[in-house]
């Protein structure tokens, strides 16, 4: 009985030492710019990578109003960023201020 208790205690310690159940791996998400507008914004979690892809013929940016990112996107280019923390982040294009969107980043 004592040996079983030690084994269970060791397993419990190992479980908590590695952080419990595995957290979800960071995902790669894409936001496409086309026809002078940002495409659909996917569900995001802190740690995810966003690929901003400009399929338009015009130069754009994806610029956070809180200054957490500013992605320069010449025509037919793409750039990656990693979202660091949960919360809402409003963004826009510096060249075309009517182009706007919001990232809703979950923990």
Question: Where in the sequence are the language-model features?
Answer:
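Extracytoplasmic copper-binding redox domains, predominantly the cupredoxin/blue-copper superfamily
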Residues: 2-4, 8, 15-107
